[in-house]
Amino acid sequence: MNKFAIVLAAGKGTRMKSALPKVLHQVAGKSMLAHVLTSVSEVEIAKNVVIVGHEADRVIATLPKGTQFVKQVEQLGTGHAVRIAADLLANEDGATLVIAGDTPLITGQTLEALFDYHFAQNATATILTAIAPNPTGYGRIIRDENGSVEKIVEQKDANDFEKSITEINTGTYIFDNKSLFKALNEITTDNAQGEYYLTDVIEIFKKAGQTVAAHILDDFDESLGVNDRVALSQAELTMRKRINHQHMVNGVTLIDPATTYIDSEVTIGEETVIEANVTIKGNTFIGKNVLITNGSRIENSEIHSNCEVRNSTVEESRMSVGSNVGPYAHLRPGTVLSEEVHVGNFVEIKGSTLGKGTKAGHLTYIGNATVGEKVNFGAGTITANFDGKNKFNTEIDDFAFIGSNSTIIAPLHIGKNALTAAGSVVTEDVPDEAVEIGRGKQVNKLGRAKKMPHYRGQ
């Protein structure tokens, strides 16, 4: 049987108190809507429709290529939101999943199990329910004396007895598709909110003698719908625990999982060790046998096997096998370290490529440079690459030796096996195997110190 999906992503999210549409707030580095769409994609769906409304264009811009969407111009309730997908789905034979775009913790496995249960029960509608420790705010599942689902009552419409019920509606359903759109034409706004409730179709199905089933979630956390920043932080915490657990199961050592923040799209190889207070964000790849020490931050980068990142920041950069950085180094966007490169204390590199075996041990800035193999940068070296308007490139060939406190005024080229003397200001190209000296000659004025303000006598 064909499977379809409708993802509800039209709400404003007033309680978030944000200019950003609610479904675009991020959990573990990915929007809540993207998490939901990922889970839906794990089920074999013939057609997926996203309902957009508030800030529709911003939401549409984030959708995967080819995703179908419908704009809900007026937000008149969940029933209305589903009904406007009629032109795309109403005539289809099959079962339709309806899910909210602010439920980032729900998994593809749960959705697959929900479809299986729906088909096994030969149901017209199947509700994904959960037993809530505190059901306040959720719609309650009302069952009859035989335990069958009778209806769903929203919090604002519930009486005291109904409010005491702990089985709640998670807001995720599967419906027989044609029955769903037929019932949606019968619902009204006669309720406390004055909206078209999707849940009202359940009572319509029951009155028609159709089967309404309920599948209870094993993990209540999956049911979390995010309506404010408090719930967002709860979703972040739960997702982070889930991500960290999976990495540890896969052979990664996390010294302190409670202070380790790993985004959902990060890949990490076996035998890698990650110490406390580490953040790894975005689309980052980390290979095998990597050491990442306390306080490091890595974002949208590739760190290949046998590398070390010691208390450093790596952004949009690539570290090849056996390279190491830190402590207190900063690889800025566009940096590429070849194999066995060493970047040490308080070194900053931006938009540069360093060849195999090159070393910049301390207190160095390298920007917009192409550096060959086994080049050595002395402490205090900088490439002066910016004139206030334009950035300029520096080229340094294999085996060059850059003396401490050299200032390299780009654009220029330093040749193979060339050497710059300590303290030089390099303003011209340096040929292969040349020694460059670009500093004033030292002169000692004997006895002159006695006339200087600092002098304290014998």
From Swiss-Prot:
Chain intervals for the UniProt region annotation (Linker): 230-250
Region feature N-acetyltransferase, mapped onto this chain: 251-458
Pathway in which this enzyme or protein is active: Nucleotide-sugar biosynthesis; UDP-N-acetyl-alpha-D-glucosamine biosynthesis; N-acetyl-alpha-D-glucosamine 1-phosphate from alpha-D-glucosamine 6-phosphate (route II): step 2/2; Nucleotide-sugar biosynthesis; UDP-N-acetyl-alpha-D-glucosamine biosynthesis; UDP-N-acetyl-alpha-D-glucosamine from N-acetyl-alpha-D-glucosamine 1-phosphate: step 1/1; Bacterial outer membrane biogenesis; LPS lipid A biosynthesis
GO CC annotations, alphabetized: cytoplasm; membrane
One biological process term in Gene Ontology: cell wall organization
Annotated keywords: Acyltransferase, Cell shape, Cell wall biogenesis/degradation, Cytoplasm, Magnesium, Metal-binding, Multifunctional enzyme, Nucleotidyltransferase, Peptidoglycan synthesis, Repeat, Transferase
CDD domains membership: GT2_GlmU_N_bac, LbH_GlmU_C
This protein's record includes keyword Nucleotide-binding: no
Binding residues annotated for Mg(2+), in chain numbering: D102, N227
Positions of the catalytic residues: H362 (proton acceptor)
Region feature Pyrophosphorylase, mapped onto this chain: 1-229
Pfam family, one: NTP_transferase
Free-text cofactor note: Binds 1 Mg(2+) ion per subunit.
Quaternary state and interactors: Homotrimer.
Protein family: In the N-terminal section; belongs to the N-acetylglucosamine-1-phosphate uridyltransferase family.
UniProt protein name: Bifunctional protein GlmU
Naturally occurring in which organism (per UniProt): Lactococcus lactis subsp. lactis (strain IL1403)
This protein's encoding gene: glmU
